[in-house]
């Protein structure tokens, strides 16, 4: 075993599907077997213990999803950015993870309460440490990404998720050793797929089928391990098709399957159940390229459907929004006014969105 990699896990003593906050939970309320969940978790634990040191955080009653430690936060070096959970059903986990990191001497950063960010579930480091892939669209806000750049001194590449089945980045995207990337392209918008193609050469990209995607093949743990003086690249996952296993084998990876079907009922698998707490910092500080603008709208915003068209335009263009002010006219014939903060992953996307918004009648606020 090697001490180079440390992974945080949480025993599933209180795990169950108690509510619905993603599509996988629908129809599975209280249909998970605690006994099988314990057995599958321990099998994963034993597999990973072969390749890494496993740290544990104590499970807490009332917080069944605490077992998914990938969402505790994002760790680089001795710094952690704690999660701000989108759903109230998970927000009670935050202080327990905060105490765990503080007790071990990490520098802990916390985002504003109004800014959701779900840790390493939505932020995955390129395995060479060159940049951080960060997801947004369902659980994490794009406006959280500049904080990651500032606090962690890392280049952040923002990817927009568009398939609600793949609500976290780590459910459909897995950076691997030596620049390889395992991912499900249909989970991303066009801009994000173009960005992936620009950063990852074609020979390094491993797009997977929907069949493998719904088995959470991308929700995998990749560990490099030295065995008898020989380097071994291990990918631990719930399940992979024969074709995918062959593709990975041809690229020098050893696939280790371990069933995690009880956790799929809650929308998670191997990666969701783990958090790597030994991620090295990149060497050079980076600046954020994420853009923000404020626009002003005035008119019969609701009756005309203008406000909905504006917000839809922002999202369809690859951006995100926050309504800062909305003043509704007192009478039906009165006009309404709104201020909306628009965020985009880079200047080109912002320029395209702003052009469309101005065509709709929006005014850019200096």
Where would I find each of the regions flagged by the language model?
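A conserved regulatory-domain signal marking ACT and ACT-like small-molecule sensing domains
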Residues: 288-366
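The feature marks the mature, well-folded catalytic cores of soluble enzymes
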Residues: 1-285
């Amino acid at each position: 075993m090697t001490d180079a990699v440390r992974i945080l896990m949480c025993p599933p003593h209180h795990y169950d599907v108690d509510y619905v906050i993603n599509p996988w939970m629908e129809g599975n309320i209280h249909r998970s077997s605690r006994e099988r969940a314990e057995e599958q978790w321990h099998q994963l634990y034993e597999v990973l213990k072969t390749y890494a040191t496993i740290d544990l955080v104590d499970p807490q009653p009332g917080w069944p999803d605490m077992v998914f430690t990938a969402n505790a936060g994002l760790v680089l070096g001795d710094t952690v950015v704690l999660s701000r959970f989108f759903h109230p059903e998970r927000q009670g986990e935050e202080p327990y993870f905060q105490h765990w990191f503080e007790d071990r001497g990490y520098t802990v950063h916390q985002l504003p309460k109004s800014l959701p960010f779900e840790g390493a579930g939505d932020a995955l480091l390129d395995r060479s440490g060159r940049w951080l892939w960060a997801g947004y669209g369902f659980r994490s806000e794009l406006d959280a990404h500049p904080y990651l750049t500032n606090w962690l001194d890392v280049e952040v590449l923002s990817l927009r998720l568009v398939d609600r089945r793949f609500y976290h980045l780590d459910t459909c995207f897995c950076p691997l050793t030596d620049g390889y990337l395992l991912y499900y392209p249909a989970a991303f918008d066009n801009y994000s797929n173009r960005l992936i193609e620009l950063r990852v050469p074609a020979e390094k990209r491993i797009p997977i089928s929907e069949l493998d995607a719904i088995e959470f093949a991308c929700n995998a743990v990749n560990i490099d391990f030295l065995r008898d003086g020989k380097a071994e690249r291990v990918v631990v996952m719930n399940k992979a098709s024969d074709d995918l296993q062959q593709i990975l084998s041809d690229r020098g990876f050893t696939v280790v399957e371990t069933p995690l079907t009880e956790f799929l009922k809650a929308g998670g698998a191997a990666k969701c159940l783990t958090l790597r707490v030994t991620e090295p910092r990149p060497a050079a500080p980076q600046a954020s390229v994420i853009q923000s603008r404020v626009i002003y709208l005035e008119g019969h915003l609701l009756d005309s459907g203008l406000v909905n068209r504006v917000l839809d335009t922002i999202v369809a263009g690859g951006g995100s929004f926050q309504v800062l002010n909305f003043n509704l006219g007192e009478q039906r014939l009165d006009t309404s006014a709104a201020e909306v903060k628009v965020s985009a992953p880079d200047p080109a996307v912002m320029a395209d969105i702003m052009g469309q918004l101005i065509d709709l009648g929006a005014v850019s606020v200096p």
